[in-house]
Amino acid sequence: MASSSNYDGILLGMGNPLLDISAVVDDEFLTKYDIKLNNAILAEDKHLPMYDEMSSKFNVEYIAGGATQNSIKVAQWMLQIPGATSYMGSIGKDKYGEAMKKDATAAGVNVHYYEDESAPTGTCGVCVVGGERSLIANLSAANCYKVDHLKKPENWALVEKAKFYYIAGFFLTVSPESIQLVSEHAAANNKVFTMNLSAPFICEFFKDVQEKFLPYMDFVFGNETEARTFSRVHGWETEDVEQIAIKISQLPKATGTYKRTTVITQGADPVVVAEDGKVKKYPVIPLPKEKLVDTNGAGDAFVGGFMSQLVKEKSIEECVKAGCYASNVVIQRSGCTYPEKPDFN
């Protein structure tokens, strides 16, 4: 094993830090707020009363979340090397923001938050029915991230130090300027830049900005629903996840340093990995239904596990194995949480 100093700040994430407000709800609640399971959306006005209703009607848990932050925390947990990961995003100056800072720091992540004076820390309603989750994000302060924060010397130093970057697609709606700086830096310095399709609405309504950064993506993550939405939006006329994964991996690249690898998870079905015009499928670890708590954070955990081995320059097979291990741990718990130490080798 290389000395831990080689891993100092090796992985940097940027995204929307959100406090998950998670509860097992009922179908009636989903219908009332027009919520579909296995989806992720931004809150509209009609959703705003939902958060209070959740806490008054159901048994609510508050868990530090946000897609990229989840993945970075899981990577940090898998690596067990202090300071291997860093993260930037925007929180409010309030108790939720403080709680988030405490949580991420306790997880061993080097967080450099932008603290917004006017907006409260963002929240994400996590509605669980039958173990499946739906996410309704009220970004608030997370939406206020400014590229000026990234440009500050102490923050840009994190970009310089990192060799791998992960940004969830959700951040495209917040600070494309920041994504541009980081992706161009990665390309110019032969570093590895990775993103996630993240949600159908990103592929559909933020198609142009997503396409702008696709050439920079060395790894593209997503799930089967997002992949099919991506295919439809691009007029590919195929629902076949393997074909879609190949097509995504063959889209133009900004540099020839790395070939693009596309990694699509499909819940309990095998993980599809496309590179070089070929597809490989990797089975996930089966889990009996009664052990499933909820799928919140499953995709994030997969990416975290995957990245934890990628930074060690392990094979794709090892990376997928670690991703499957991490998501298997997380779906047996509420939210994107994990025990003290991983049991992965």
Curated annotation (Swiss-Prot):
Keywords: ATP-binding, Cytoplasm, Host-virus interaction, Kinase, Magnesium, Nucleotide-binding, Phosphoprotein, Purine salvage, Transferase. The active site is at D300. Its cofactor is Mg(2+). It holds the Pfam family PfkB. Phosphorylated by KIN11. GO terms for biological process: adenosine salvage; AMP salvage. It is found in: Cytoplasm. Its main location: cytoplasm. Pathway: Purine metabolism; AMP biosynthesis via salvage pathway; AMP from adenosine: step 1/1. Its EC number is 2.7.1.20. One of its GO terms (molecular function) is adenosine kinase activity. Widely expressed. Inactivated by the begomovirus AL2 protein or the curtovirus L2 protein. Belongs to the carbohydrate kinase PfkB family. This is Adenosine kinase 2. It comes from Arabidopsis thaliana. The lineage of its organism: Eukaryota, Viridiplantae, Streptophyta, Embryophyta, Tracheophyta. The gene is ADK2.
